[in-house]
Structures are given as structure tokens and as C-alpha cells.
Amino acid sequence: MEMKIDALAGTLESSDVMVRIGPAAQPGIQLEIDSIVKQQFGAAIEQVVRETLAQLGVKQANVVVDDKGALECVLRARVQAAALRAAQQSQLQWSQL
């Protein structure tokens, strides 16, 4: 899946996460994480983001995660929504999700 535009999903409210995804100039996933629980869960957040993007077939993107203590299911949903918006996909492939 190719990222065509910058897109975001989520809010900065407590127990939520804002995910921004856009096209990258370099190959790979460039990931920046800012989280109130980064010391405890930073590695888990990175793993969930990278797994979710891999499931969607994203190989090249700039990703910024601003986490306010979101649950894993919320993080996954926000990453999926932002990636689909950035790829400008209007038809969902439910089997990928």
C-alpha cells in the first residue's frame, strides 16, 4: 500500500492516540513515538504499529504516534484508519483488517 498524502486519525484526549501517516522519501517505516507511557510500553507500541502497517502492506511511510494511554485495540484502529486515508483507499479490503 502506497502512502499518497498526509493523513491522521484519533484525538489527543486521554486514553486515545493520534496517528499521523504520510509518504516517506526513504525506504522503510520512519516511526516517531511520543507517549505518556513510553517508558513502560514504548516497545509494545512500536511493535503494534509496525505489525499493523505490515498487515496492510505498507512498506514506506513516515509515522508519528502521539499516545495518551490508548489501549492496543484503539492504537490498531487508529493506525489502520490513518493508513487507509493516507493511501486514499475508498474500498476497504476487510480481510486485511
Swiss-Prot record:
InterPro entries: CitD, Mal_deCO2ase/Cit_lyase_ACP
Phosphoprotein in keyword set: yes
Pfam families the UniProt entry points to: ACP (PF06857)
Residues bearing PTM O-(phosphoribosyl dephospho-coenzyme A)serine: 14
Subcellular location: Cytoplasm
Domain of life: Bacteria
One CC-aspect GO term: cytoplasm
Chief subcellular location: cytoplasm
Keywords: Cytoplasm, Phosphoprotein
Family that this chain belongs to: Belongs to the CitD family.
Subunit comment: Oligomer with a subunit composition of (alpha,beta,gamma)6.
HAMAP family: CitD
UniProt function note: Covalent carrier of the coenzyme of citrate lyase.
Protein name (Swiss-Prot/TrEMBL): Citrate lyase acyl carrier protein
Protein's organism: Klebsiella pneumoniae (strain 342)
Gene that this sequence comes from: citD
